[in-house]
Amino acid sequence: NYFKKKLPKKSVMVGDLNIAPYEEDVWDHKKLLKIVSHTPEEIEALNDVKSSANWVDITRKDIPSGLLYSWWSYRARDWDTANKGRRLDHIWATEDIAEYGFGSHILRDVRGWDKPSDHAPVFASFDL
């Protein structure tokens, strides 16, 4: 596994992983179980990667509960009102620095800009 063999200490991985692993990372867990980005197979694969190097999901460490999304479909013109999102963008850190991560937030308002991405920026700070 690449993430385990070549992983330096004090690592942070960020990106659009296109998988929403938790029930509160999608607008309707049961409806999305057969939809790409929230299938049991994808969640299991992502969890395997996460556990292979003991990655810590910094966003969920900081915001452990509640609905949390970083993506809303372009097909939904009323994306803000409908709020049918998914948390597809992640910030993970190795255990040795995870405790220093704080202040995670998603800039939801950016999704409402003229000609926006369907993803909103995800932030976390680290006091190293």
Residue locations for each model-derived region?
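Acidic/histidine-rich, metal-coordinating catalytic segments
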Residues: 9-23, 27
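Metal-dependent phosphoester-hydrolase catalytic domains
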Residues: 22-128
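A long, amphipathic alpha-helix that forms part
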Residues: 1-8
